[in-house]
């Protein structure tokens, strides 16, 4: 048995002496125990295309923040490479990729810019809405070959405050306010939640609305994720939505569970909780990519900047910087390991025709929320080491930290509420009636 793993040879020391300090290690720590068996050729292709676009994504990030949305040019590029088809059914021109593909694509986008990752989150809603009744789906995909951007965006779909809908012949009269409609400028349809009434019956539903029926408020002024295009959409006067564009949330589990009999592709083999867990995977994979992108810039800047104190020629030569680099890398790799493990598990359960329990989902949600926070902690550590130069708006590294804080404020990602929800399961207490990382069950 060789001792090379534990004892460095003179050759090792000679080789190390020839390496420049602070070189960025591109090869990630191994994170998969299944050898990436759920990664598809199409998923790899899209990931590689995004990597090629990364310089453009980063170059446009500051302007996108000022405009409140990604540029038309970038949206067109994402459309060209097939980003907005990733979770659509093959039968309607989509790719129907599984959770591992989704995770890798989201991570690659996050390395460039968080809001670019968020536009993919918007597009991934096709996984759910494609399971709705056929007439709605036919209308949704009518422009799939010509539309530039995501086919659908959504606002306040599961929120406590939504729109209203009252029954009329052949449809519904709808009005209301739908907040956080991410991607609304580039979407062909807008989905929104409604409290509906039909005589003595009432409940929660979703409606597919034409953007022309809505007014967009210029209210997306935030400290991070400014380019996510998350304006509020309103309709102060009632407008008509046909029956075909209305979905009763009571039927949501039945719709999602029917997907495997309607469509091919791994995305549609996942059942209700597996589908919802995939959204959580996507969310946190964006954060992992952001932390990896932040690390790239951290290494670059640490090797090109002089510290305020102590008197080293470069920030990278400070012991505290070296410790921070090691800790940050370990935090990011640990987060990636957890999320990819869940992605692979979701795909495995989907191929076996099973689903997860409520307890499985709640624990998975808190695990992924926790490692999402770990990514933010790693980014904060790197920013702190770089000092005041890292908070200048002209320095792109600061955007990762700001965007990370806003993402983790999302209701489906907040650590403490998710901990309480999971804790009730773990302690054997009666669980809350919730699903999808803490959303109220509105069925």
Protein language model features and the residues they cover:
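Amphipathic, small/basic residue-rich leader segments at the start of a protein or domain
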Residues: 1-124
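Generic structural signal for well-ordered, non-transmembrane alpha-helical segments
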Residues: 48-51, 289-292, 296, 326-333, ...
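C-terminal helix-coil-helix/basic helical segment that borders enzyme active sites and/or dimer interfaces
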Residues: 58, 62-65, 333-370, 383-391
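Glycine-rich flavin
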Residues: 72-80, 85-188, 202
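DPxDG-like acidic metal-binding loop motif
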Residues: 177-220, 229
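Glycine-rich beta->alpha junctions and the first turn(s) of the following alpha-helix
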Residues: 224, 232-332
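Extended, amphipathic, non-transmembrane alpha-helical segments
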Residues: 300-302, 335-341, 377
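Glycine-rich phosphate/cofactor-binding loops in nucleotide/flavin-utilizing enzymes
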Residues: 386-443
């Amino acid at each position: 048995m060789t001792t090379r793993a534990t004892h460095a040879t003179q050759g090792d020391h000679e080789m190390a002496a020839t390496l420049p300090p602070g070189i960025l290690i591109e090869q990630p720590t191994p994170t998969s125990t299944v050898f990436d068996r759920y990664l598809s050729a199409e998923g790899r292709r899209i990931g590689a295309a995004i990597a090629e676009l990364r310089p453009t994504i980063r170059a446009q990030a500051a302007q996108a923040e000022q405009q409140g949305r990604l540029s038309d040019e970038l949206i067109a590029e994402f459309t060209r490479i097939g980003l907005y088809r990733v979770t659509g059914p093959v039968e309607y021109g989509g790719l129907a990729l599984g959770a591992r593909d989704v995770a890798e694509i989201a991570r690659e986008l996050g390395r460039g810019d968080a809001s670019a990752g968020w536009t993919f989150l918007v597009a991934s809603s096709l996984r759910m809405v494609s399971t709705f009744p056929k007439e709605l789906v036919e209308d949704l995909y009518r422009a799939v070959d010509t539309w530039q951007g995501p086919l659908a965006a959504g606002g306040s779909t599961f929120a406590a405050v939504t729109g209203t809908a009252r029954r009329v012949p052949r449809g519904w009269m709808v009005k209301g306010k739908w907040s956080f409609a991410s991607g609304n400028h580039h979407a062909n349809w807008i989905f929104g939640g409604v409290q509906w009434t039909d005589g003595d019956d009432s409940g929660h539903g979703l409606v597919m609305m034409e953007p022309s029926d809505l007014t967009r408020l210029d209210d997306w002024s935030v400290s991070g994720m400014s380019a996510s295009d998350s304006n509020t959409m309103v309709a102060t006067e009632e407008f008509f939505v046909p029956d075909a564009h209305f979905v009763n949330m009571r039927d949501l589990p039945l719709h999602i569970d029917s997907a495997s009999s309607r469509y091919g592709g791994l995305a549609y083999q996942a059942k209700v909780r597996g589908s919802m867990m995939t959204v959580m995977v996507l969310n946190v994979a964006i954060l992992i990519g952001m932390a990896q992108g932040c690390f790239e810039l951290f290494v670059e800047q640490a090797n090109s900047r002089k510290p305020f104190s102590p008197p080293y020629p470069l920030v990278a030569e400070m012991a505290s910087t070296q410790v921070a680099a090691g800790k940050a890398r370990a935090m990011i790799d640990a987060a990636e390991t957890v999320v990819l493990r869940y992605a692979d598990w979701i795909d495995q359960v989907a191929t076996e025709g099973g689903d997860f329990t409520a307890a499985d989902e709640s624990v998975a949600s808190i695990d992924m929320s926790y490692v999402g926070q770990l990514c933010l902690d790693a980014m904060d550590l790197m920013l702190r080491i770089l000092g005041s130069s890292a908070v200048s708006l002209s320095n792109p590294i600061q955007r990762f930290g700001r965007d990370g804080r806003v993402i983790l404020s999302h209701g489906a990602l907040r650590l403490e509420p998710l901990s309480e929800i999971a804790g009730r399961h773990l302690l054997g207490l009666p669980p809350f009636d919730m699903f999808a990382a803490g959303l109220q069950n509105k069925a």
